[in-house]
Structure formats: C-alpha cells, structure tokens
Amino acid sequence: LTIALTATGLASATLVSLFAINKVIGKIATSKDLLNTRNKEIFNWRFGDISYSVTGEGKPVPLIHNLKEDSSSIEWSQIIPELSMNHTVYTIDLLGCGLSDRPDMICTSFMYTQLVGDFVRDVIKKKTNIVVTGKSAAFVLEACSNEPDLYGDLILINPDSIRNFRKAPSKRTKTAVFILKLKIIGTFIYHMMCRKKKIYNYFEEDGFYDKENIPEA
C-alpha cells in the first residue's frame, strides 16, 4: 500500500510539473504573435473552423502547407507578396494546424482530401491551380483525382511518397496516438518536438539549401 501511495504521489507531482511547464512554454511560444489573426477569415467546415487568408487579385492559387507537427500557413509568408501581384492567393491552415480548430479526433488523409475539395468548391468557387508541399501532396493529389474539373495546374514541392499514406496504422502507431491523446503528456511531447532548436536543425540539414536564407524568428 505504501509503495502504491508513493507511486501515485510521484505520478501526480510529475503531471503537475508537466502542466506547469506546458503553460510556461505556451506563453513564451505565443508571445511574438507570429500566428496573428489580422486579415484572417473562417471557413466553417463540418469537422471544425478552418482559418485562411486571401491576398491579391487574379487567377486563384491556394497554397497548402506541409503536414508536420509544426506546420501552418506561415510557411508561405515569404512568397505571398510576390505571388499575390498577379494571383488571388489563398493560404489555409489545415485542420489541427495554425489557427484552425483542433478537434478531439484523429485527422486522416481522407479527411484532408475532403477539406481541400470542399474549400475549393465552397470558398474559391472556380477552377484553380494549386501549390502544395511535403506530406500534404498525397491527399491533394487524391483530391485532384476525385474531382479533376476543379483543378488546373498542380505544383508539388518536395512531395512525400503516396505509398506512405496508404499504410494501415501499426500497433506502435496506435500506442503513440493513445499517449499523445493524454492531454498533459501529449502537449509536453508536442512542445519537445516543436522546440526552436529542433526546427532550426531541420532547416539547416534538410529545409534550406543556403543556410543564409533561414529566417530569424
């Protein structure tokens, strides 16, 4: 009984500490307001509100960001000014990313395929070219295949293999999902995966050819 009480006490203390750490990290991470809400619009999608912005005039071009733990529409911030000179540029935060809703559910590639199609159909409302990067390329290709009349030219930037998105979840994946859905523990793991040093290491090793082009945050 004593051992059980001690273990319970240690577990509780650990969770309290992680909760406090999460609060501090969250406050520091949002202090610069990098994901500001200015000029943002909301697409009331059936699985949650989707944040997006519209810039410029001309042929429509939605920009679909990568699907990593630290991804959001801010990835496109360096090219929007030039691209918007001749296009209507739509930058979207995918469900669970940026300023969009984070529903208590597992977001699948099929769900993102539906999101892209619904956004083009209900918000843009005309045939559009589309630009996508990284892991998101797979479900955008699926969306284009489902409704080819909605899309014109498609630009893929560093696309991941479509085969990776057709794999069934393994037991290891299901265990990881269970742990990540434990709010305090999952949030702490997310913060560790998205810490500034880790992001900059990715930029230096894989993200940028020229390190001098890495933006300061």
Model-predicted segments: where are they?
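Conserved alpha/beta-hydrolase catalytic His-Asp/Glu region
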Residues: 166-167, 190-217
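Active-site loop/oxyanion-hole signature of alpha/beta-hydrolase fold enzymes
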Residues: 91-131
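Gly/Ala-rich beta-loop-alpha elbow adjacent to hydrolase catalytic centers
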Residues: 131-140
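Alpha/beta-hydrolase fold catalytic core
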Residues: 1-61, 87
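Active-site signature of alpha/beta-hydrolase-fold catalytic machinery across serine-
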Residues: 78, 142-146
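Conserved catalytic-core motifs of eukaryotic protein kinase domains, centered on the activation segment
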Residues: 73-75, 100-106, 165-168
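Flexible "cap/lid" loop of the alpha/beta hydrolase fold
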Residues: 145-146, 151-184
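Conserved HGGG/HGGXW glycine-rich cap/lid loop of the alpha/beta-hydrolase fold
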Residues: 53-99
